[in-house]
Amino acid sequence: MTEQLPLALFLMGPTASGKTELAIRLRQRYPVELISVDSALIYKGMDIGTAKPDEREQQLAPHRLIDILDPTEAYSAADFRRDALAAMNEIVAQGKIPLLVGGTMLYFKALLEGLSPLPAANAEIRQQIEQEALTKGWSVLHDELQEIDPVSAARIHPNDPQRLSRALEVYRISGKTLTELTETKGESLPFRVKQFAIAPKERAELHRRIELRFDKMMEAGFEQEMRALYTRKDLHPDLPSIRCVGYRQMWDYLDGNCTLDEAIYRGICATRQLAKRQITWLRSWDNLTWLDSENIEQSLETLSEAIASDRDSCV
């Protein structure tokens, strides 16, 4: 039955690896439609610091699932899977190929493998956890998570109360850890997926790209964009939107906790750390074809051949 399923392409990669450029070039050759797989690009008013595709790029290749939420709102992997599947089905109905582009690996994993059934939020238990945090501190609760679920504790920072609270809540409701429950796969993706990842061969080149992009963001007005968010008064640094790399560091600057130069340096370092995590995740990914950021033409040919060969096999 697999050959009857529609084709979908995944184009993954670390930040600043050239995913957007390659995706736009591919769309100019083939009937593909782009779906963003990025937990930062979903937010309106956060354009410069997320390196969101600009107006020209959006005209060349419109991206779905960009600018869909206000920065005050949360968005889960389950929300993404629902929205991405709906977009993929629309694209296939138009006789085109969904091309999913981004660097949020959790979203790709949720889409590909489905999501395990987690218990619904419990307001009473959540309130109890928050009260404990007020009296003991989040670091003590993180130590508790470390004892019951060291895998989740390694992924969740002590200063990330939303995710830390949820991990403890899940355990207290179900008696099972978040790690145990997420190992149970949900409904698989009803598509034939060809998966690609793009990155520079050398880490130093990726670091250079990250620093260059951050400098360009500052020149483009990232500080002004951040000030507009800061002065809204309905945002705070614990929101998922403001925890995005670059935004958290610039928020600290506006809060008076560091200088602008320190915020820029910390933002670049945080982006490098994000890229390292993305690459580590991709190296453990199955059925993945690697592409070279420094050879866009060859990468484009590899993607084109994958589409052409799939068409030939379906004839």
Swiss-Prot record:
It is an enzyme of class 2 (transferase). Keywords: ATP-binding, Magnesium, Nucleotide-binding, Transferase, tRNA processing. Monomer. The keyword tRNA processing applies. One of its GO terms (biological process) is tRNA modification. This is tRNA dimethylallyltransferase. Residues 38-41, 162-166, 243-248, 276-283 are annotated as: Interaction with substrate tRNA.
